[in-house]
């Protein structure tokens, strides 16, 4: 796989609280320069990213219910609508992990369905936070996402105790079939990214995108 091909797997990511406007501008410039698929940013920076990415092919991805996923469903749906109105091309929502742990699967499904409906055709990725789930819970969550028809299931927020693993990516891919799988959290080098892709990932979320496509080591990135 060429570096240009690998770049098209990457959502170039900046989600930590201290990221400022200059950081987001730099992120957008890097995404254009290296041909990344998208930038993944908090929704307050969508207007800035829209301005910086004008005329390019780089998409704007934003997060909803991030990073805990425990917001009211109505709030998630409203956040989704407002983000799309502002210019988001893709939505990454966080599933309600507490409801999964409470076996409230109907509520889990309704939560995702509400955001999916709010997307109104905009691609939706559902973040499972796999490090907090059992294998059975991962499978059940993936089955719900497949039934609803979301665009992707995603491993992690990158804000918890663990990120993507090859094992979890393979399990998710085997469960969802043709739906996309996004590996995120802890993917910081070429070898790891390629292992995730081999396991079934069709998108990589990373703040170390430049290191991933260039084959260098990134010791600074946190996502």
Curated annotation (Swiss-Prot):
Its main location: cytoplasm. Its EC number is 4.1.2.4. InterPro entries: Aldolase_TIM, DeoC, DeoC/FbaB/LacD_aldolase, DeoC_typeI. CDD domains: DeoC. Keywords: Cytoplasm, Lyase, Schiff base. Pathway: Carbohydrate degradation; 2-deoxy-D-ribose 1-phosphate degradation; D-glyceraldehyde 3-phosphate and acetaldehyde from 2-deoxy-alpha-D-ribose 1-phosphate: step 2/2. One of its GO terms (cellular component) is cytoplasm. GO terms for biological process: 2-deoxyribose 1-phosphate catabolic process; carbohydrate catabolic process; deoxyribonucleotide catabolic process. Pfam families: DeoC (PF01791). It is found in: Cytoplasm. GO terms for molecular function: deoxyribose-phosphate aldolase activity. The active site is at 92 (proton donor/acceptor), 154 (schiff-base intermediate with acetaldehyde), 182 (proton donor/acceptor). It catalyses: 2-deoxy-D-ribose 5-phosphate = D-glyceraldehyde 3-phosphate + acetaldehyde. HAMAP family: DeoC_type1. Belongs to the DeoC/FbaB aldolase family. DeoC type 1 subfamily. Catalyzes a reversible aldol reaction between acetaldehyde and D-glyceraldehyde 3-phosphate to generate 2-deoxy-D-ribose 5-phosphate. This is Deoxyribose-phosphate aldolase. The lineage of its organism: Bacteria, Pseudomonadati, Pseudomonadota, Gammaproteobacteria, Pasteurellales.
């Amino acid at each position: 796989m060429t570096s240009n091909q690998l770049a098209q797997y990457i959502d170039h990511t900046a989600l930590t609280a201290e990221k400022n406007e200059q950081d987001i501008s730099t992120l957008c410039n890097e995404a254009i320069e290296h041909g990344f698929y998208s930038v993944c940013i908090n929704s307050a920076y969508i207007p800035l990213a829209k301005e910086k990415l004008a005329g390019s092919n780089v998409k704007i991805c934003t997060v909803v219910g991030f990073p805990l996923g425990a917001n009211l469903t109505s709030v998630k749906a409203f956040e989704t609508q407002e983000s799309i109105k502002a210019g988001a091309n893709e939505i990454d929502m966080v599933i309600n992990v507490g409801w999964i742990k409470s076996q409230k699967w109907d509520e889990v499904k309704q939560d995702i369905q509400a955001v999916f409906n709010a997307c109104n055709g905009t691609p939706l990725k559902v973040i499972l936070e796999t490090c907090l789930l059992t294998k059975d819970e991962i499978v059940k969550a993936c089955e719900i996402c497949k039934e609803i028809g979301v665009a992707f299931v995603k491993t992690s927020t990158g804000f918890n105790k663990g990120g993507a693993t090859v094992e979890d990516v393979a399990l998710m891919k085997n469960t969802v079939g043709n739906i996309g799988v996004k590996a995120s959290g802890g993917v910081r080098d070429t070898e790891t990214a390629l292992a995730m892709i081999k396991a079934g990932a069709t998108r990589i979320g990373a703040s170390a995108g430049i290191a991933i496509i260039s084959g260098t080591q990134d010791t600074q990135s946190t996502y």
